[in-house]
């Protein structure tokens, strides 16, 4: 079996799904043209970063969807320690995949490709490792190390 770039595949599939939803629902941009993920990225490149800009609108929409899916996942998790219920692991896994759908949509709406996402992830991972090595806590929290991640 050939090795594939799975993160790239996820980003491609999600972009295609989003474009299909925009088309099916006849969602349009402020210019009246049919909306697609490329249009959101182009708005980013034009610097349309204000509260009424297309990127902000769709980042907000995808964040709300992500929060909704997180709430659905939370409903699947048991908290009554006195209960004899068991978790539905299959549905929990599906809810986690739903979270990935909207996390990927957020990344795409922020103009990230799979490669850019991976690069930022590994840079932030190094920051997190360094924080742990230094005994990270609220008292030592310094967001300046995040500023160097570009």
Feature map (PLM): residue ranges:
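Flexible "arm" and connector segments at domain edges
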Residues: 1-150
